[in-house]
Every structure is written in structure tokens, then in C-alpha cells.
Amino acid sequence: MNTSPVRMDDLPLNRFHCRIAALTFGAHLTDGYVLGVIGYAIIQLTPAMQLTPFMAGMIGGSALLGLFLGSLVLGWISDHIGRQKIFTFSFLLITLASFLQFFATTPEHLIGLRILIGIGLGGDYSVGHTLLAEFSPRRHRGILLGAFSVVWTVGYVLASIAGHHFISENPEAWRWLLASAALPALLITLLRWGTPESPRWLLRQGRFAEAHAIVHRYFGPHVLLGDEVVTATHKHIKTLFSSRYWRRTAFNSVFFVCLVIPWFVIYTWLPTIAQTIGLEDALTASLMLNALLIVGALLGLVLTHLLAHRKFLLGSFLLLAATLVVMACLPSGSSLTLLLFVLFSTTISAVSNLVGILPAESFPTDIRSLGVGFATAMSRLGAAVSTGLLPWVLAQWGMQVTLLLLATVLLVGFVVTWLWAPETKALPLVAAGNVGGANEHSVSV
């Protein structure tokens, strides 16, 4: 056995790393499932509860509102009280709220419960990515963090399968569909029990003995934590907008929003869009393109390993924008439309791996959860607003203008990435989060 001193950042991948990754991915599987099943449940909920279009939209978007709140609040709390407590609490909340959906009797009940589910998921996004980043070795950190997109997509596709199965002639099937999310959530809650605290966070709090005890227990007595600097001050959300960090905050928030808006808009309304752009069998196109999301996410893992993160993101923004512009210029039903939609689906799924990597690597330990939480919150706010506006935009201006607007959003993401994106690939976590270091690419404006 090798007993020479080695930094935690330089360790080979081991079973403990895989365990933390699997427990983190459980949140993304559940998130994809929760956001996917609601579209099918609303088919039955609309006549059963006599939903108005506004109330149906509120139920559909309530989990995104919760994600916004949970990402901000629980991310900030975890920087103060630790990662492990929120890592466990978030899924207790998700499990309970998911189960209680079975007994909902009014639209307001469902909205409240799905906001609670979203709060749990939002907090878990902030803390899960942070905890995984703080344990992962630098050579494997990108793949581990980026793999969440694959798992999220699997959850989303499983929701489609469950939706087709549950939504039948039984008018109460929606209860079983929504409550079914409690099963994976309960399993994840039980498996997370006993997860250790982040030693990097403990070291930042001056709790040296606890930090080194965790490192020695899970990695060995020869493993060193690295170059974390102890800080006595507590950080607040205004720290993200200080002269030191505002570019990192702006980049991570804007690039996340600019990827999520076209993703959620197109895939929330995929059957409608498929018909509008002239795809003959909307259901077949929807199922095929959902399957392509998994292919794209797997391709993204390979590209994340091969390419610099910054170049991968810049190239993807340009390709996605160009694809939508060409689609907007084609006549409805053009033979090229499906091919371009396949290219768009694969590319956006592939590059979405970076939303799990870049925010977690862009901030130092004492504000990492806060930074990840803020970027996630902004992405969910953008998704909720844009998804809600899509029917109105389609009715007012049509599909051509809608696609051009989405292309504009992607070009904004390109510009912000070019101006402020750091290159964090394969760096020690301390160096990746070091503003002003050799990895900086900020352009003064």
C-alpha cells in the first residue's frame, strides 16, 4: 500500500467517491422525475379539480418556485451550519411532501406541497454539488459533477414512461403518479444517513481535528487536505456581488439561465412545438427526442473529459443558436427540421453537463454552496418565467419569432461566457475557485 503523503485532490477514484456521487445523483434522478410527471398528472387534474389555465400553470411551475427558494436559502444556510445536515434534511422534506400529494384535495394543497418538494430539491442542488466537488479528486471531478445531467435525463424519461402507464381511465391515477416520487426519495434518505461532513468546510471553520479525522477514516492517514485557508468570517449573499466575486457570480448565473431557458421551454412544450414546426407524429417525435437527451448527456461526459470547459461551452452556445436560427428560417414541415432538432437536442443535453461542474468549481469553499445555490436559483426563475410565457409568445408572434428569441438568449450566454468564464478543468479545487488566478479569462468592461 502506498503511504507517501498525497493531497486529497490527487487521490485515485475510490468506492467512497462513487458512493457520494451516487447519493448526489439521487437528487437529480428525483428532480427529473418530479418535473417530468407533473405534465401527465395535469391531464387528469384539469377536469378532476376544474383547473383554470392559470391554476394549471401554478401547479406546473410550483416546484420550480420551490427550487428557486431552496437554492438560495438552504445553500446559504449550509455555508454556515455545514453540508451534511442539509444533505440529509432536504430529502426528508422531499419524501414527506411527495407522499402527501396522494391526499391532496385542492389545487392549493398541490401547489404548497410541490413548493416544498422544490425547496428540498433546490437545497440539495446547492449542497449536493458542493459536497461532491469538495470530496472529488481533480482528475475525476469534471466527470463526476457532469454525470448529473445523464441521471437527470434518465429521471425525466422515466417520468414519461410512468406517465403513459399511470394516466389511464382511472380518474384518480394522478395521485399514484405524483406520490410515486416518494419511493426513490425515501431510499435516498435512508442511504444518506451517516454521510460525513465536508472536511474542507470543517477546516474553514477551524475544526482541524474533525476535518483530519474524516480524511483519515475515508482515505487514509497519509492523505492531506491541501491548501484550504482558514477564515473566521461568515459570508453573506452580498459577498457574491463584491468587487472580487461579481464576475464569477454573473457568469455562473447567466450561462446557467441561458442554457436552461431553451431547454425547459422546448421540452416542457415538446408535443406542441413538434406539431407547430411540422413534425407529422408529435408523440413519436417527443419520445425519440427524449431518448436523444440521454445520448447527448452521455456524449457530454466524453466531451467534458476531452475538451476545455470554456471552449466546450462557447462552441455549444454558438452551435445551438445557429441551429435555432436556421430552423426559424425553414418552412414548416421541411425535411431538415427534424435533423436540426436532433442536433439541437443532442448538443444542449451534452453541454448541460457543465451546469453541474462550473458553479461548484468557480467559488471558494466558504461561499461555494451560496454561489451554486444562487446560480441554480436564477436558472429556475428563468425557466419558470420563460416556460409560463411561451404559450403567450407563440400565440402573439408564432414559432419563427419564438425560435429567434431563444437563439438570442443563447447568444447572450456566449457573450457572457467569453467575457467572464474561468477555465477550471483539472485544477485543484482551491485553485479553481481562486479569483484572479492563472485560470481567469475575465475581460474588463
Swiss-Prot record:
One Gene Ontology term, aspect cellular component: plasma membrane
PROSITE patterns on file: MFS, SUGAR_TRANSPORT_2
Highest taxon, organism lineage: Bacteria
Keywords carried by this UniProt record: Cell inner membrane, Cell membrane, Membrane, Transmembrane, Transmembrane helix, Transport
Transmembrane annotation, as ranges: 23-43, 57-77, 86-106, 115-135, 143-163, 176-196, 254-274, 287-307, 312-332, 338-358, 370-390, 401-421
Nucleotidyltransferase listed as a keyword: no
Family: Belongs to the major facilitator superfamily. Sugar transporter (TC 2.A.1.1) family.
Full protein name: Inner membrane metabolite transport protein YgcS
Lineage: Bacteria, Pseudomonadati, Pseudomonadota, Gammaproteobacteria, Enterobacterales
